[in-house]
Amino acid sequence: VWFWLLLASCSVFVNAQQTPARDFSKETARVSPDWVKDAVIYEIFERNYSQKGDFNSITADLDRLKNLGVTVLWLMPVHPVGRIKAKGTIGSPYAVRDYYAINPDYGTAADLKRLISESHKRGLKVIIDIVANHTAWDSVMMKTRAFYTQNTQGEIIPPVPDWADVADLNYDNAELRRYMIEMLKSWIRDYDLDGFRCDVAGFVPTDFWEQARMEVDKIKPDTIWLAEWESPDLLVKAFNLDYSWENHSALMNVLQGSLPASEIRRVWESQHAKFPRGALLMRFSDNHDERRAIARFGERGALAAQALVFTLDGVPLIYNGMEAGDTTESGAPALFEKLPVFWQIADRRPEFPRFYKSMIDLRKNSAALRRGDLRWLKNSDEARVLTFSRTIGTEDVLVAINLSNQPFFGAVETSGVFEEITPEIGAPLPPDDDKPKAKLKNNAGLPAISLDAFGYRIFRRKN
C-alpha cells in the first residue's frame, strides 16, 4: 500500500523527467550469475525472529534454513535504531542512526561475522538491508547538515510527511555520495557480504546506484543487489533484481475477489512490455510491509498465493514465519514493536512446512520452473483460475491455480500426455506406500482438470 502512495506522490516529477520516454524494453538487463536466477530469498527481521531477537539465534537456526532449501538470507537493517521521533515502543529498523554500527540488541560485529561465515559454510548467501534514502533524526551524520534535504527555512525535512521518524538525505551533495559509497564498500570488504537489499531504491538517483555498484564490484563482483521499487531503469546497470509490487497488488485484489484472476496475466504482460530483456523481478505474497497473507485469506488462500510465487518467472521471497503458518501481526505498527514469530504454530499447521520445503525442492529440481519461458494458457474460467506453462529445452511444466474460494472443474488449453508432480503436503505416507509413485506415473487427464477451492496443481509433459 505504501509503495503506491509513494508512487502517486512523485508521479508528476517522474513524468516531467522522462520526456521523451526511454524504451527500456529494447535494452538488456544487467546479467546476473546463475545463483541469483535460481535463488530463493528468505527475509529475516532479527528483532522478531526469536524471543532473544539476536544474530546468534539466527546462527543456531541455519541448519533448519538450509534444509528448508532457501539460498539467500536477507537481514533487515542491522544498524542501531534512532530514538528521536521514533515510532512505536522500539522504533523502525529503517530509521538508522549509524550505517557503520551494529544494533546492540542484535549482538556484536563478531556475532554478525560469525552468522555470515556459518551461512557461507552451508552454501547460503547473506545480504543486508541498506536504507540509503534517509536516516534517523539522531544520526551521526546530522553533524553535516548539508547531507540533508532542507526546506526554504533551512529546516531538515522527512522524505514524505508520513515518515516523520526519518530525515531525507540530499543526493545533490557530492560528499554525501562519496560517504555512502565508502560505507557500502566497507560492508562488503569487512563482512564478506553477498550484496544488499536497497530500501525505497527509486527515491535515490539511479546514477548514484550505478556508480556505487561499479565501485563495489571492484571488491566483490559476484553479488546480488535487490531494489525495493519497480522501475526498469534500475535493472540496466545497478541492480540484479527489482520488486514486483504491481503483481503483488493484483494478487491480493484477486484473492479478495475485487479483480478477476486474468488481472495477474495483464500485469505480467505489462511488465514484460516495459522492462529490459532478461530483467528479474522478485515475487512475493508476504513481507514486513504487509499484513500476513494467512491472516487476510486463510490457510488455503495463503498457500495458493505462495504457489503462484514459486511457479511464476522471477525469484521467490519467503518472509520469516510463513513456512510455519505464523499469523503474528506484520507490517506497521508491528514493525515498531517486539512481536516474535510464533514458531510453535507449525505443530498445528504441519502442511505449511511441508508445502514450503516440497515446493522449493520441486523448483530446485525443475529448470523450467527456475528459468523457463512462461506462456499463458487459456482455461474455461479465467476470472478465477490461472493456467500457464514454463518451458526450457525439452522440459515443459504446466501450472493451474484456483485463486477463488469455490472449486473448479473445467478445461485448460493444452494437448499431449502429462504426469502430475504437485507436491503432497498431507500427512506422510509409510515408506513402502506406492500411491505417490502411481500418481506420478498415471496420465493426468488433461485438458480436463479439477481444482479445489484455492487449489493448485502442477504437471510435467511426458516426452
Regions found by a protein language model. Give the residues of each.
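Conserved, mostly hydrophobic/aromatic
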Residues: I44, L65, L75, Y99, ...
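Bacterial N-terminal signal peptides
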Residues: W2-S11
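Substrate-binding/active-site clefts of carbohydrate-active enzymes
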Residues: P20-I41, E46-T71, P77-Y191, Q211-K220
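Active-site groove signature of glycoside hydrolases
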Residues: D165, Y179-T206, R283-N287
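Carbohydrate-interacting/catalytic domains
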Residues: F13-W74, P80, K113, E118-S119, ...
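Short, solvent-exposed turn/loop segments enriched in Gly/Ser/Thr/Pro and often Arg
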Residues: W74-G88, D129-D138, D199-P205, E228-D233, ...
